[in-house]
Amino acid sequence: MAAGCLLALTLTLFQSWLIGPSSEEPFPSPVTIKSWVDKMQEDLVTLAKTASGVTQLADIYEKYQDLYTVEPNNARQLVEIAARDIEKLLSNRSKALVRLAMEAEKVQAAHQWREDFASNEVVYYNAKDDLDPERNESESGSQRIKPVFIEDANFGRQISYQHAAVHIPTDIYEGSTIVLNELNWTSALDEVFKRNRDEDPTLLWQVFAADRLARYYPASPWVDNSRTPNKIDLYDVRRRPWYIQGAASPKDMLILVDVSGSVSGLTLKLIRTSVSEMLETLSDDDFVNVASFNSNAQDVSCFQHLVQANVRNKKVLKDAVNNITAKGITDYKKGFTFAFEQLLNYNVSRANCNKIIMLFTDGGEERAQEIFAKYNKDKKVRVFTFSVGQHNYDRGPIQWMACENKGYYYEIPSIGAIRINTQEYLDVLGRPMVLAGDKAKQVQWTNVYLDALELGLVITGTLPVFNVTGQSENKTNLKNQLILGVMGVDVSLEDIKRLTPRFTLCPNGYYFAIDPNGYVLLHPNLQPKNPKSQEPVTLDFLDAELENDIKVEIRNKMIDGESGEKTFRTLVKSQDERYIDKGNRTYTWTPVNGTDYRYLALVLPTYSFYYIKAKIEETITQARSKKGKMKDSETLKPDNFEESGYTFIAPREYCNDLKPSDNNTEFLLNFNEFIDRKTPNNPSCNTDLINRILLDAGFTNELVQNYWSKQKNIKGVKARFVVTDGGITRVYPKEAGENWQENPETYEDSFYKRSLDNDNYVFTAPYFNKSGPGAYESGIMVSKAVELYIQGKLLKPAVVGIKIDVNSWIENFTKTSIRDPCAGPVCDCKRNSDVMDCVILDDGGFLLMANHDDYTNQIGRFFGEIDPRMMRHLVNISLYAFNKSYDYQSVCDPGAAPKQGAGHRSAYVPSITDILQIGWWATAAAWSILQQLLLSLTFPRLLEAVEMEEDDFTASLSKQSCITEQTQYFFKNDTKSFSGLLDCGNCSRIFHVEKLMNTNLVFIMVESKGTCPCDTRLLMQAEQTSDGPDPCDMVKQPRYRKGPDVCFDNNVLEDYTDCGGVSGLNPSLWSIFGLQFILLWLVSGSRHYLW
């Protein structure tokens, strides 16, 4: 009985699948649908193969083997050579640093401090003179130089090699005795700057960052008014990561915040801001956490131990600090017990160097001696204390805490003292480095960051400069323990890239380098989008690629300094980040000795183990093409586009005197004119690059002349194209090339790189533009890599393809899918059917073809936005898999700023949120001025001036760094057919799915979504803003890293009796007034142009 019921139920379900709910006509059988798909596939592949000439181009390469050789890409040899070249480059820069540091110490030791200077005695060029042309008068005791500048291609700006420039922060009085003395003795560095450049003309910026100024060479205006007029300069070299890194060893820091009831109002706001500023003095080599205390102590965030001080973790801590509230009573014992126990927890990843507690409080009577006696008897943990706000507490107890624990005591009575007093602790941490002498003289290399003087992405080598005044020749008499400053030398990433040539590796081969934190120095996906970001560019290798267990292993071995090689199959994200392909890659890595970036790797796909090298012969460059009509180089001239097809060449550095240009026509003319004047064998040229592009020009021209031009117009084909490794792109006919939108640099072209990784014909969806014309009008791109075996060696030197007219494709498709006879509406895919949706998607889930006109206008759109429920079901049945990836280099509009109405784009039109936020700054500034007026009468040396943070005012004016997430879809497996019911609760939709062999396409036939309303929530693929992975979870399993090899955190000779107090502060009250009145003016409605 039970078996009979089960059989009846099965038959009923089967019949309901065959007969759709909206029609009595049966749904086409899988066999029928497959026959349609097979016919479509055959027609498409035949069309693409015939029209593109993929076989013919392969024949041309094989026919003319005498014009080139096949050379090996020996991965081990290539990576070793590149590693040694990078090592040599950084070593040369390090030598320049050492010369500068030695001279600086020598000159300063001989310098006689002076209280007075004669008028115009100190001569220098102030880099900020051009910021205010009407205010170029010199301060008392100094005289300004007026350099003659020339435009320099290496720096991309106005330069004078005859002088150095000086930048003095806005909060520093240029005429002060300290500044005049620093200007005086650092002027001797100019000659060393020049000698360094004479020895190595490729040197870029050389900088000495002292306490109150930065001297850099060559001289250049700080701001180019022609590019960024009316910009307020708020730069301070002391806040730059490279200066902070060079001034002290890594830190384990616990910030302890008093949140008792007495800490309220303005004091609490000052503490919040002070903690945020303190966090900005930390780099990725440091570890930190923030705890609050009153009668109890607790972490302010989800972090329960020290965490790496990276950008994301610091943001979590800043957000948490901004939410703390004040209540209860102060118990220093509870607070310090909590701080010491967390700071001394060695079971977590940490810096294992300077151990620091930073106490922010409004003061108190308790000293907590027994806690220090218990946890810090040997004084291995430094305690810095900050008395914040105006109050009547005795400063003695918290000053005692600092003095007893080798720290320093600071007072922050107002906003004006925050910036300077939250960075002064670096001088204390620098004492052991000075006392260590030459042992501490080790060049360190920074993370990648954007140069303040618009040099682009750079790394900086740093070396501390010590005050050796009074030191004996044998360095046993150490009378001084102060750091004078940090010396820096920049290295452009472009210079390093030139040592890792890529144009023989094929577009999917690349080098990358990482540091001990796992951050990349080189990687094709290292592309920060925020040109104004002050943060270092810290992109982890596992975030630059699609992570898997093998890559984690490779990263760990590289950090450990091992050499190795591994071949495996991996997921590869496309250049345009819309697709994911699967490909075999071989990773080969080796150490780079003597640098922080000690690890270099080369990644090669299997088809780039060999490459084509054109023979270096005059006959190649000047011979006529095999057709005999014109020289190979002449086929690149715009005058010959009608005959040879519209031609693009990759904008590469073929010769030193031939600069790449984004204007293809201009570049082609310059290229041909150069070739006519000079042979490619000219010493200033890259002979291999030029010969290869000329070789490809001849081969592709022969394809056009002997094949494409002889074919009759093929219906449905809008264009044909060929793209080569050598950098040639030809589009035929000429008219089609005039609308060509692909990247002329073939190594950065998404469809080209995808074609190499796929053996099939790759159909590429155009970009969907909601507000623009239909994307389908440009045609559907179909491409195929040319595959060769020359002497048994696999090569893929080019990609050919066509663009298909969508309307012709739809017409052929509907004819293919019509059944005869067909009495009902369900039996086929007739155009604009009311009950049947027939679509073709690519492997990324993008729409390429449909039987509905309203779908046709959405060609190129992700199917999850068109039929969300069906797309979700395609994932559920394992047709598609997906990968969610994060981009940590994105920029977004400020989240708090809504779209504004009319008004000049450069003017600040604040939102309510902005007004509330900045309102506090205005209020606090007003209070600060009143406090300082009163305090100056009693304590004229109490306060320190400060530069205000640029981001406080400009964050809402431009893009902000942010995290975005994007989901890429791809075929999960090789299964060809899927059938079933899409259940929508009250109704269902029958569907059948069939992949098209030898392509990246899939055909879907499904009952119309209009016949069965279902879940309409869009499934998004496009990039969206995101919070990224939860940092609270990430810190529980931190990625493997190694800190610096050396640590200078304690020295028995250290004199720590200088531990702070108001007597040590030397303010510039009028600087504070000026800055804060400017602040009030800015936030009170002035339409000041900040950029």
Curated annotation (Swiss-Prot):
Which residue ranges run through the membrane? Answer: 1062-1082
* Residues annotated for a divalent metal cation binding in this entry: D258, S260, S262
Family matches, as InterPro entries: Ca_channel_alpha-2/delta, VDCC_a2/dsu, VWA_N, VWF_A, vWFA_dom_sf
**GO CC aspect terms:** GABA-ergic synapse; glutamatergic synapse; L-type voltage-gated calcium channel complex; neuronal dense core vesicle; plasma membrane; postsynaptic membrane; presynaptic active zone membrane; sarcoplasmic reticulum
Q: Where is the VWFA domain?
A: 252-429
The answer on whether this UniProt entry bears the keyword Transmembrane reads yes
Q: List the disulfide bonds.
A: C403-C1047
Q: Which Gene3D superfamilies match?
A: PAS domain (3.30.450.20), von Willebrand factor, type A domain (3.40.50.410)
One GO BP annotation is: regulation of membrane repolarization during action potential
Give the residue ranges of motif MIDAS-like motif.
Answer: 258-262
Pfam families from the entry? VGCC_alpha2 (PF08473), VWA (PF00092), VWA_N (PF08399)
- Topological domains on the Extracellular side lie at 25-1061
Topologically, how does it sit relative to the membrane? Single-pass type I membrane protein
Can you tell me which residues are glycosylated?
A: N92, N136, N184, N323, N347, N593, N769, N876, N973
Q: Does the keyword Amino-acid biosynthesis apply?
A: no
Instruction: Supply any other comment.
Output: Binds gabapentin, an antiepileptic drug.
The free-text domain remark for this protein reads: The MIDAS-like motif in the VWFA domain binds divalent metal cations and is required to promote trafficking of the alpha-1 (CACNA1) subunit to the plasma membrane by an integrin-like switch.
User: How is the quaternary structure described?
Assistant: Dimer formed of alpha-2-1 and delta-1 chains; disulfide-linked. Voltage-dependent calcium channels are multisubunit complexes, consisting of alpha-1 (CACNA1), alpha-2 (CACNA2D), beta (CACNB) and delta (CACNA2D) subunits in a 1:1:1:1 ratio.
Its recorded name reads Voltage-dependent calcium channel subunit alpha-2/delta-1
Report which gene this protein is encoded by: Cacna2d1
